[in-house]
Amino acid sequence: MASVSHTKPAKKSFRVGRVRAFLRGRVWYLCYHENGKRHQPRVGPDRQSASQMAAEINAQLEAGAPSALGFEPISIPDLRDRWLEHHEHVRRSSLQTISRYRAATQHLLDFVAQVRPLRRASDFRPVHGEEFVRYLRSKRVAPNGHAHARKRTLRDCGIRFILETCSTLFNYAQRHRHLPPYVENPFRTIEIGRIPIEDAKPVVAFTADQERRFLEACDDWQFPIFLTLVMTGLRPGELTHLLLPDDLDLVDGWLFVRNKPNLGWQIKTRNERDIPLLPELVDLLRFVLGDRRDGPVFRQRRCCGDYVPPLRGHTRRTLESEMTRRIPRADASAEGSERKLRHAAAKTLWRDLGAIKPDWVRKEFMGLTRAIGSPEVTAPKTLRHSFATSLQDANVDPLIRNELMGHSPGCVSGVGNTLGMTAVYTHTRPETKRRQLEGALRARPAAAIAKVWLAKRTFETRGPDDSPSAQANARQEASFCVARPVGEARSPNSPMTFEARAGKADLRVSAEHNGVPGSPAAT
């Protein structure tokens, strides 16, 4: 009679301390709780490997350390969505910043979808990061984002920004335990900071001659706008969102850069500041504004004619009420869309106020730089660079420079700041700020050109002031400005000069009639 085998079947589960292992089909899984959350990671078909992993995780749980498998696997597209939502709802980053982050991380999503398919963010290794850099260097993109624009390869600074953004994305994944514990950020091994920038556009600051030719090329609508940028260092968005009467004091000569959250606009750094105005700029703004006491300081070109903005005459309070009325009720389930709806409503509000779009400032700037033979200069922030350079040339105190530029918080807390607590305890008096700014800008031709421009417009409006003192001042001011003859060859698309528009033969002719401007009629 044959013997019968009584071998016991292998157990399908076992426990090691706080960790239970069980067999499902042919694969071993672990089950344990960490920080109140249940984890059930897959180990593999080998029972011995499952036993070793269970013992390792149990030791980590007993020691209070993060478990080796205690992370939440997530795909890279889902990780990116969570990260952007974190910036939207938790960090409250600006919509422009979120848009830039979305565009930068889209390159990573394209890489994962087209070149290296990876199921999870935890599968992205340093070798994939290096492959991603090679992919970026070979990719051709439209520099302005338009589908039909000529494409070119990414610049080094663009590649660095994309890599820094993706590195920040994986830092978020580490903090929220979407990567295995003790696994390094795959972008950290690339050493992004050591990637050289070899093809960056040079940073340009206008020379005195370029500044003179640039301002002389402006028409009557452009001149007050760009003179203000030259003499205050404002960002274009700050200039286009100045409101009367709160942001401009022509009696004491101050310009106030203020956040306007209830009107859908805030300063880039959220840092408000006060900027003293030179007397020449005060006189010019008084002439341009006339008796207008509301609306944007600088209005659209069509407002110089018969166009009347729909919201003309509204006060700050009524504008805020109008803003609230224009925001449609956001769906309760679509919390993230509220800011976008508010942003869209703000754009229409400022348009109906007659405000200039910041992009229009850039278009006008590019037209002027083409007219003076510098088509490669395309960014209005060139004027901001020139302003900062003028402060440096005049040895303006670094703290005052930071305040005038709106960089004070970054100076106090920035890396490499040598002033330390001195910057915190230093409070600049308004008269000190005004004195140093005037000393810096007096060396530039802008103030003298402003006087000549205002003298011409005043002469055209009221007639000349023939007093000896006025004529002496006119000769002194005109000596700073080298006039361009009317018959000089010009580009057919370039703006007309002062003398051509006024019908004068030479800029100095009208400068002879320079008087002290009074309270002119509204323009």
List each language-model region with its residue ranges:
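C-terminal secondary-structure termini that scaffold catalytic or DNA-interacting sites
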Residues: 1, 252, 262-265, 272, ...
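A short, basic/aromatic helix-end/turn motif that makes direct DNA contacts
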Residues: 232, 241-248, 381, 402-418, ...
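Short, charged phosphate-coordinating catalytic segments
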Residues: 171-185, 229-254, 398-403, 483
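Basic/aromatic DNA-contact patch characteristic of tyrosine site-specific recombinases
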Residues: 1-77, 81, 89-90, 99, ...
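Basic, Lys/Arg- and aromatic-enriched nucleic-acid-binding interface segment
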Residues: 145-146, 151-156, 160-164, 175, ...
